[in-house]
Amino acid sequence: MLKLFSAFRKNKIWDFNGGIHPPEMKTQSNGTPLRQVPLAQRFVIPLKQHIGAEGELCVSVGDKVLRGQPLTRGRGKMLPVHAPTSGTVTAIAPHSTAHPSALAELSVIIDADGEDCWIPRDGWDDYRSRSREELIERIHQFGVAGLGGAGFPTGVKLQGGGDKIETLIINAAECEPYITADDRLMQDCAAQVVEGIRILAHILQPREILIGIEDNKPQAISMLRAVLADSHDISLRVIPTKYPSGGAKQLTYILTGKQVPHGGRSSDIGVLMQNVGTAYAVKRAVIDGEPITERVVTLTGEAIARPGNVWARLGTPVRHLLNDAGFCPSADQMVIMGGPLMGFTLPWLDVPVVKITNCLLAPSANELGEPQEEQNCIRCSACADACPADLLPQQLYWFSKGQQHDKATTHNIADCIECGACAWVCPSNIPLVQYFRQEKAEIAAIRQEEKRAAEAKARFEARQARLEREKAARLERHKSAAVQPAAKDKDAIAAALARVKEKQAQATQPIVIKAGERPDNSAIIAAREARKAQARAKQAELQQTNDAATVADPRKTAVEAAIARAKARKLEQQQANAEPEQQVDPRKAAVEAAIARAKARKLEQQQANAEPEQQVDPRKAAVEAAIARAKARKLEQQQANAEPEEQVDPRKAAVAAAIARVQAKKAAQQKVVNED
């Protein structure tokens, strides 16, 4: 009974809410085998073909490259891209890529040489002897990404799963109309796909491996069953055809009955999902040693004469693939990259094929029908009934149209998988997916701006905190320096105290002189001589300063000379008028007169040696000379009119008269010199 229940649960499948059943339109392209496309003359390889940042360039313009040669380096989540063929790098510049707005991204442009030479390939046939880390690194460096449409780096996804993965799901549903790339790959390369699944299982070591495939692919189902005939570790689950059963959350629920939590990932419930195309790329990377340089692309639509599935080199222009398939465009021809529900219209055909390109749809006017005008929402709730994510598309539409980002976020717009089921059933022909895509892009931009603002605020606060810490540390250092002297200051203070103590000790010690010896006073004498020399040097410096000040001002010098002469004459007059009983020693008088004359000559010499630019005013000099002559005449007259009882020594009078005449003569000469 338990075995029966276990077997029943093993094959049980669940059903999700919502979903639609549009026309499949798969028979146009799934009936012919995979074929190769002739090489294009020029390849455009965008550096970013996956979720995450672009890699670092490792080639330059003019370099020769081989097929499989890395064009960028992959570090962290950055996935490298590789040359799709051999040739020459002719440019590295922005180029329009696979995007609804054909945004330009940095790309490497290669001109093919037609030889299509590979780099040396090193396959790992013994991959089971390799460690988990080695296999993940090889998968990452060979550029393998999710080929089901998301483009998430496979190596990063495997690394993030860790040891908590219990169920490995291989997505082979391919539920969107027109697309048959995975269907044809399983028909033609079923053994290689299974080998890639085994490599993934060796890395993850899951408890069970499930392949989910819709029942509208009978040939692929039969091929997989034939390859898995002797395998008991891989289970093939055939599920009913329903759109969008190929969604990650929807297929997880169908096969396991587990729901991925809101805002979480499938790895949170022990599930990891990979696409069949990704499994095939893993096999070629690990066993064959070939980086991902091509993928299967469906070429379909009534505007294509030879629809089918082709091996398209990454970087091949869309125009080249369509022309090879017999593209017959109409006047208003539309080309869609992807399916009719989740794809987008290309603005022009020069965009390249990338890793997430699974279909190129060129429908005729009859296939699409007449375009319907968008009308107002009638709140019929048909979109809510069809939504596989259990959302309220009509409410999200109003929030998106009214720029109510908070309410849109509250109503879980991030859980929208953009499957297009709501727009398919809308009777008002409202392009709901376009509104939701735009709203999610605006919310992402707002969050990115908020993140940048928060980071800038954190940097500012960290800087302010650092400055405050430095200021506090600086104040603390200043306080410590004020309270405690530095080490060198302590040493200097200690040395000074030691010297003082030594001198005090020497002063208190008595001087003992032995008999017959003389005391040694050489140190005292040397100190005394040093003090005398220092005093003389200081006095000489002071004298030089005074002399310089005297020479610097010629008028001051002249005034001092006049004062000296007046003092000399006053002294002579006092001597002449002295009473007879107060006779002055003639030798002393002669000495004083000689000193006065010497001072006068010194002052005149300093005045004569003054700087040329410091000349005395000639008029002032003439006035001084006239005053000196007048004073000399007055002195002579006073001497002549002196009373008889006050006889003056005739020699002194003669000396004074001679001095006066000499001074008058010098003043006159100085006047003549100044006038010249």
From Swiss-Prot:
Residues 369-397, 407-436 form the 4Fe-4S ferredoxin-type domain. SUPFAM superfamilies: alpha-helical ferredoxin, Nqo1 FMN-binding domain-like. GO terms for cellular component: plasma membrane. Its cofactor is [4Fe-4S] cluster. [4Fe-4S] cluster 2 binds at C387, C416, C419, C422. It comes from the Bacteria. It is found in: Cell inner membrane. Part of a membrane-bound complex that couples electron transfer with translocation of ions across the membrane. Required to maintain the reduced state of SoxR. HAMAP family: RsxC_RnfC (MF_00461). Belongs to the 4Fe4S bacterial-type ferredoxin family. RnfC subfamily. NCBIfam families: PRK05035.1, rnfC. This is Ion-translocating oxidoreductase complex subunit C. It comes from Escherichia coli (strain SMS-3-5 / SECEC). The gene is rsxC.
